[in-house]
């Protein structure tokens, strides 16, 4: 399925974002190097003034508080159109009651689109992953007004939805740099960029893949096509296994040639899309990317992240590597830690993140020091869950694309769609 098959809502328009007029600083070193050498020398002798980024808080850009709708798609299953009049009225009433919720989701989606428009062309080989993560997250903080959690009355009201995933090559997910990481993005790398925005706990989860070497183009095309196939198949009363089957069929129809070797693109069969719940990135339902026999159905009003991962490896990931991602446990544990440091850290986590995922860098930013022992203590007590990087076999390459969708009574809304993917 292609992007052209998705019909944009007139209200959405998803128009180009003139970020230059909003004052987003563009660091284009290449152009500076190509400038006249005499003028360049003069400029270097002048005192450099740091440009101030004027990314505006999103509320200032939409003073009426109404945010653009996503791209609308019809349900293609007949049974979604067979509602009785009473049922139609009931679902319409529910949609009206959910208006504030939908608007929060759309607000997060608009921020996500603006952030990726600001950063996508600035991701180039030679950058440290740490700098890429900071660029994405600081832009998100500026749009959401969550630049200083310590100064916010409610740090969980809106801001970053989860740590920025910057997973390279055979690592498919759950990698973000910890303090001191010096990893540099290379021309031959394939990097999954997965970041989130949340407004009142309503999370936008959307991801894309960056590569520079054209030999990976077919890998990215396969995964993007598979993701849109999943979006097309999704709908009220649709069985999850049927979505996975459709995704698998499309993904496996692609081949990619890398360094003279031809590989079938395989779905990473133990990675899934998922429903999203308030302040919980994984809401309870998993959307497979292979046929798995799960007859659970999607329901009206649900909020899903449809994501697919394709690999040139075995199509199966295992956990391994230094942990960076954490989240408060979904289970209600009565046992509390005995260490004072662990108790204090838990209070910091509860106040600033609640059940939203976080990473070590976020604790660093809050001024936490020497907290790793306390954090591991919380993990051992089951109060915090750690999420190690997920890897296919070394030497393989993985790609990811993802969108957040809303299931309305009569249509689905691809709320995070932009003009880029």
Swiss-Prot record:
Q: Which residues bind substrate?
A: 174, 282
Question: Carries keyword Hydrolase?
Answer: yes
Q: What is its main location?
A: cytoplasm
Give the binding site residues for a divalent metal cation 1.
194, 205, 402
Which GO cellular component terms, listed alphabetically, does the Swiss-Prot or TrEMBL entry include? cytoplasm; nucleus
Which enzyme class, named as a word? Answer: hydrolase
Instruction: Specify residue ranges for compositional bias: Basic and acidic residues.
Output: 28-40
The cofactor remark states: Binds 2 divalent metal cations per subunit. Has a high-affinity and a low affinity metal-binding site. The true nature of the physiological cofactor is under debate. The enzyme is active with cobalt, zinc, manganese or divalent iron ions. Most likely, methionine aminopeptidases function as mononuclear Fe(2+)-metalloproteases under physiological conditions, and the catalytically relevant metal-binding site has been assigned to the histidine-containing high-affinity site. Also zinc has been proposed to be the physiological cofactor for yeast.
Catalysis performed (reactions): Release of N-terminal amino acids, preferentially methionine, from peptides and arylamides
**SUPFAM superfamilies found in the cross-reference section:** Creatinase/aminopeptidase, Winged helix' DNA-binding domain
EC nos: 3.4.11.18
Q: Where is this region: Disordered?
A: 1-53
Tell where it localizes. Cytoplasm
UniProt feature, compositional bias: Basic residues: 41-53
Sites of Phosphoserine modification: 35
**A GO BP entry:** protein maturation
Entry binding sites for a divalent metal cation 2: 205, 274, 307, 402
HAMAP family for the chain: MetAP_2_euk
What function does this protein fulfil? Answer: Cotranslationally removes the N-terminal methionine from nascent proteins. The N-terminal methionine is often cleaved when the second residue in the primary sequence is small and uncharged (Met-Ala-, Cys, Gly, Pro, Ser, Thr, or Val). Plays only a minor role in N-terminal methionine removal. Less efficient when the second residue is Val, Gly, Cys or Thr.
Additional detail: Present with 1080 molecules/cell in log phase SD medium.
**Under which name does UniProt file this protein?**
Methionine aminopeptidase 2
Its source organism is Saccharomyces cerevisiae (strain ATCC 204508 / S288c) (Baker's yeast)
């Amino acid at each position: 399925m292609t992007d052209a098959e998705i019909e944009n809502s007139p209200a959405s328009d998803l128009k180009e974002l003139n970020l230059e007029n909003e004052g987003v600083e563009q660091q284009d070193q290449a152009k500076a190097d190509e400038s006249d050498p005499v003028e360049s020398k003069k400029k270097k002798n002048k005192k450099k003034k740091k440009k101030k980024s004027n990314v505006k808080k999103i509320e200032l850009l939409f003073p009426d508080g109404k945010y653009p709708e996503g791209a609308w798609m019809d349900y293609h299953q007949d049974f979604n159109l067979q509602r009785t009049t009473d049922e139609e009225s009931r679902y319409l009433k529910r949609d009206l009651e959910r208006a504030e919720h939908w608007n929060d989701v759309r607000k997060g989606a608009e921020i996500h689109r603006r952030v990726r428009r600001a950063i996508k062309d600035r991701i180039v080989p030679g950058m440290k992953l740490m700098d890429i993560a900071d660029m994405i997250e600081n832009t998100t903080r500026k749009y959401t007004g969550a630049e200083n959690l310590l100064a916010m009355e409610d740090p969980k009201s809106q801001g970053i939805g989860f740590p920025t995933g910057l997973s390279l090559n055979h690592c498919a997910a759950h990698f973000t740099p910890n303090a001191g990481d010096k990893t540099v993005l290379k021309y031959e790398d394939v990097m999954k960029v997965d970041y989130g925005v949340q407004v009142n706990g309503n999370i936008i989860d959307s991801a894309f893949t960056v590569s520079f070497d054209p030999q990976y183009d077919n890998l990215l095309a396969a995964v993007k096509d598979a993701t849109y196939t999943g979006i097309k198949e999704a709908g009220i009363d649709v069985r999850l296994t049927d979505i996975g089957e459709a995704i698998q069929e499309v993904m496996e129809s692609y081949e990619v040639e890398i360094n003279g070797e031809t590989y079938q693109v395989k779905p990473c069969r133990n990675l899934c899309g998922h429903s999203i719940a308030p302040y919980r990135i994984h809401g309870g339902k998993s959307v497979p990317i292979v046929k798995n026999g799960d007859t659970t159905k999607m329901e009206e009003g649900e909020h899903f992240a449809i994501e697919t991962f394709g690999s040139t490896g075995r199509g199966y990931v295992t956990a391994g590597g230094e942990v960076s991602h954490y989240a408060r446990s979904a289970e209600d544990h009565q046992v509390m830690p005995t260490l004072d440091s662990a108790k204090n850290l838990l209070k910091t986590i509860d106040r600033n993140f609640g059940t939203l995922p976080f990473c070590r860098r976020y604790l660093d930013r809050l001024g936490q020091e020497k907290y790793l022992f306390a954090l591991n203590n919380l993990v051992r007590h089951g109060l915090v869950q750690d999420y190690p990087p997920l890897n296919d076999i070394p030497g393989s390459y993985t790609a990811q694309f993802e969108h957040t969708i809303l299931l309305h009574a009569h249509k689905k809304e691809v709320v995070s769609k932009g003009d880029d993917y």
